[in-house]
């Protein structure tokens, strides 16, 4: 019986293991992306079911950007229109307890264009942050409140927040303080989000301070 060449096997494994790790990370990233898309689809369907105008901006093909085809990146994910107010929205979903400020999660141009939209009367731009674990929760965070927090967090400035301030992310606790929580009802698989109630809260009082520019 021929002997086993352990050096050869180890060499094969040393080449395979990094490849398997990369593949595993790709699968995890793909799953996270898919769950983010499910969240976006649930928001869109909820708005439609509640008779709200909702326009989802089509994603730009990443390969087109990579190959420099002259296409521009989206300013944000979608527009929502309710009761005479326009809501430019960027949707983010995570299984973590905080949303990272990193470029891979929140892109600079998204912040830039949401901030630019806030200068117009009758426009309430912001993020919809979905925290999937330990229980599903969603918050609307006005871009101005987000930027105020981000500046304080990154520069470690004095503040009046009750919750812990993370230097490189915005946690659930801060969202509870500065945001408007979106209520939901779970179906068999998907969620119905009460977008109409969120809009009413923001328009009637919750974000009245921001409508003056």
Question: For each predicted feature, which ranges?
Answer:
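Basic/aromatic recognition patch in beta-strand/loop cores that engages polyanionic ligands
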Residues: 71-75, 115
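Conserved catalytic cores of phosphodiester-cleaving nucleases, focusing on short active-site segments
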Residues: 78-80, 84-96
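Nucleic-acid nuclease catalytic cores
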Residues: 115-149
């Amino acid at each position: 019986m021929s002997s086993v060449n352990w050096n050869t096997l180890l060499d094969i494994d040393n080449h395979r293991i990094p490849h398997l790790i990369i593949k595993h990370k790709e699968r995890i990233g793909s799953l996270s992306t898919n769950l983010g898309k499910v969240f976006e689809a649930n928001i869109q369907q909820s708005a439609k079911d509640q008779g709200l105008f909702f326009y989802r901006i089509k994603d730009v093909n990443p390969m087109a950007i990579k190959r420099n085809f002259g296409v521009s990146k989206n300013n944000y994910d979608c527009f929502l229109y309710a009761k005479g107010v326009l809501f430019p929205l960027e949707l983010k979903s995570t299984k973590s307890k905080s949303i990272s400020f990193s470029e891979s999660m929140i892109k600079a141009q998204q912040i830039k264009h949401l901030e630019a939209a806030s200068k117009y009367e009758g426009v309430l731009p912001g993020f919809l942050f979905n925290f999937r674990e330990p229980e599903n929760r969603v918050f609307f965070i006005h871009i101005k409140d987000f930027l105020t927090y981000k500046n304080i967090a990154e520069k470690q400035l004095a503040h009046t927040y009750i919750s812990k301030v993370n230097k490189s992310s915005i946690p659930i606790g801060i969202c509870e303080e500065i945001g408007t929580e979106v209520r939901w009802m779970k179906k068999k698989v998907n969620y119905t989000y009460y977008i109409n109630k969120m809009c009413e809260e923001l328009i009637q009082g919750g974000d009245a301070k921001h409508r003056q520019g």
